[in-house]
Amino acid sequence: MNDDSNSCCMYVSAEKANPLTLFLFTQACTNFLVTKGASVDGSNFITYAADSHIRYGELYFTPAADWTPGSMRTIYDRGTNAVRGYVPQPAHTYQVVGYINENQVALGETTFGGRTELIDPKGLIDYGSLMFMALERSSSAREAIKIMADLVEEYGYGSDGETFSISDANEVWYMEIIGKGYTPKYDKKLNDTINADKGAVWVAIRIPDGYISGHANAARITTFHLRDGMKSITDKDWKKLYNENVEIIYKHDIIDFARRKGYFNGKDADFDFSAAFAPVDFSAARICDLRV
């Protein structure tokens, strides 16, 4: 969750408290991901706590709807509620209550921030809109991943780095995403300046059944199995999205982009998402990870 300080969490020592007493400000987020093989009742579930007494005291209800061609959806900034822009509606959207839809697709998030130069100030889609549109449009966790990837590719991603928890009745996925910054380029056809790096880089990993996971405002994906067309695929392989053996999905140019930006210069097999895009600092290592 984004807070106004852009910090996942903070600590201070209190003058009148006992020595070494720490107080943790609770403007932060924590998610836990539990697969059906690890739960008592055999169900998948995720938790999404904003760790704050002033946020998310209500649930929003969006009814299912059919849309005529040309219908547009307003994109509101999650932090300010300002209108960011508009995108076309699909033919049908699903009912959503809070962060779960009628198909039992559920989402949660925590903000890890990452390299600030990778925020696209002109990116239309912020992290909140990305979550709600994924819920409105998806019938499974895997479909939600594709929808999120397609939306930021087409319209740009305008938020900090995020970790998403994505679940349905059968699977639980863990996804990390960060923008590609803003590189202005003049487009002759449009007669306008565009972002040559519009979009985002991301990795999604399925949590094995019988396991649990968690995240709390720190990027946790390091190295991962690279594309083999079976266990691991990229966005160039969407036709294989629903193959049961697929456990990893990632943006096809993620390593090339990191090299171009100077974030990584090793062998492909050694590529580390967190080290490249959100290097661990004190807060992430000692305070954010402490919560999970």
Regions found by a protein language model. Name each.
Residues N2-D3, Y11:
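Acidic/polar hotspots within intrinsically disordered regions
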Residues D4-N6, N18:
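Intrinsic-disorder-associated, low-complexity terminal segments enriched in Asp/Asn/His/Tyr and depleted
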Residues C8-M10, D289:
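Secreted/luminal cysteine- and crosslink-motif detector
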Residues Y11, F23-F25:
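Aromatic (phenylalanine/tyrosine) cluster motif
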Residues F25-Y127, I147-V292:
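A contiguous strand-loop segment
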Residues I119-D120, S129-S138:
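Second-shell loop/turn segments in exported
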